[in-house]
A protein has these predicted regions:
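Short, surface-exposed connector motifs at secondary-structure boundaries
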Residues: 51-57
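Short, acidic/polar
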Residues: 40-48
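C-terminal end-helix/capping segment
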Residues: 79-93, 317-330
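A gly/proline- and charged-residue-enriched helix-loop-helix capping module
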Residues: 83-115
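Glycine-rich loop at the start of a catalytic domain that most often binds anionic cofactors/ligands
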Residues: 65-80
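Active-site environment of non-heme Fe oxygenases that use a 2-His-1-carboxylate facial triad
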Residues: 1-39, 53, 107-113, 122-298, ...
Length: 330
């Protein structure tokens, strides 16, 4: 049998932490370990059609993948053209036309839970992670049900975020973050300006030649198919309080608070309360599910229904990513 549903008693997959509501992720196993995914493509698609929009995520395990190109074909088999990583916020390496490395932050850094590109008005509906090499220690890709996060956020905070929305401010380059050339995949300023105008991003070229952008985006969103409300933003990640205190103080002393690589405010420009951000981080932590990767695993997520992150790790680790099905708030 292809699909191996999670244990209904505690909703846990082997080492998946118990005590979290809902069967996330749903697990789909190869009938015979090592079978090529191509031999079961139709069954794989049926598993996704039946389960992705209810559980939010599917872990495909024990299927054989030859390389990143084979993974790209797997992601394409669900019927959507794969997306490029436009308006990037983190460093990645492009492996082929539509497959990227996962965020290349140092191994000692945690990447907090987030929905891909929820800092913008455009995002992918589907995202796939393929584990090519497991880290000897750590390196999990934690996930969390964004519907459950929405429900657990204090109603007053949730309403305030929803009403005011969020303004993301980014300062590119100067060796502190991605250059504008990296973020927009171009050396042409006019192309950057065209992209910004099309996507409702305010921009300014600073005296040092670097770029600053501002964009007002959603804090919550309604899934276009299921109609469910989800917590859908990266305020906790972009806010300056997400930086370690020593680094934060050093950055501010050098470039001023207005010049830090990234920050976020309410949509009207007013500051977000630190207590609200700590509450959001606490809810995300309490809702997080984590499981050890196995080499060859593919995790498929509905990007609106499920957030993802990255744990610290030791040793070599390789996880690659593909995205599909563009969605927009405008």
């Amino acid at each position: 049998m292809l699909t191996d549903l999670l244990n209904r008693a505690n909703h846990s997959l082997d080492e998946v932490q118990a005590g979290v509501e809902g069967p996330l992720p749903f697990v789909s196993r190869a009938p015979v370990p090592g079978d090529s995914w191509r031999d079961h493509a139709e069954l794989i698609r049926r598993a996704a059609d039946s389960n992705l929009q209810t559980t939010g995520g599917i872990l495909f395990r024990d299927f054989a993948f030859r390389d990143a190109n084979d993974f790209e074909e797997f992601a394409r088999c669900f019927g959507h053209e794969l997306l490029t990583y436009d308006y990037a916020s983190t460093p990645r390496t492009k492996l082929n036309s539509r497959v990227y490395t996962s965020t290349e932050y140092p191994a000692h850094q945690v990447i907090p839970l987030h929905n891909e590109q929820s800092y913008s008005l455009n995002w992918p509906m589907k995202i796939w992670f393929h584990c090519i090499q497991t880290a000897p220690v750590g390196g999990e890709t934690p996930i969390a049900d964004s519907r459950l996060v929405y429900q657990r956020i204090d109603p007053a905070i949730r309403q305030r975020f929803a009403d005011k929305r969020l303004m993301y401010v980014r300062n590119y380059g100067n060796g502190l973050d991605l250059s504008w050339q990296q973020a927009f995949s171009t050396e042409d300023r006019s192309e950057v300006e065209r992209f910004c105008r099309l996507n409702h991003i305010d921009f300014e070229w600073k005296d040092d030649g670097e770029l600053r952008t501002r964009q007002v985006c959603q804090a919550v969103a309604q899934h276009p198919v299921t109609g469910e409300w989800v917590w859908f933003n990266q305020a906790h990640l972009f806010h300056i309080s997400n930086l370690p205190e020593a680094l934060r103080e050093t950055l501010v002393s050098i470039v001023g608070e207005e010049g830090v690589p990234r920050n976020v405010f309410y949509g009207d420009g007013s500051p977000i309360e630190l207590e609200a951000l700590e509450h959001v981080r606490d809810v995300l932590q309490r809702t997080q599910i984590s499981f050890p990767w196995q080499a060859g695993d593919v995790l498929m997520l509905d990007n609106m229904l499920v957030a993802h992150g990255r744990s610290t790790f030791q040793g070599a680790r390789k996880v690659v990513v593909a995205m599909a099905e563009p969605a927009s708030a405008v």
